[in-house]
Amino acid sequence: MRLFLSLPVLVVVLSMVLEGPAPAQGAPEVSNPFDGLEELGKTLEDNTREFINRITQSELPAKMWDWFSETFRKVKEKLKIDS
């Protein structure tokens, strides 16, 4: 009885699998499969360049360097006094 029911189900499943993708699921016109990846890379490159330019043109790196230098100098002086 089980075999009698499972064979038609198996035939239907195999026919669906072998039929291939539906037209809506078919791949769009594929001129180059890496076009999307290339576009993503260019966008990422542009955003990274813009971010680096913003950082180099801002005063933040200079202020941070001054703060670290001053803090290091203070710690160094404290260690000299305590030793």
Curated annotation (Swiss-Prot):
Compartment(s): Secreted
Signal peptide positions on this chain: 1-26
GO CC, one annotated term: high-density lipoprotein particle
Superkingdom of origin: Eukaryota
Key word Metal-binding present: no
Family in the record: Belongs to the apolipoprotein C1 family.
Protein name: Apolipoprotein C-I, acidic form
Organism: Pan troglodytes (Chimpanzee)
Origin organism lineage: Eukaryota, Metazoa, Chordata, Craniata, Vertebrata
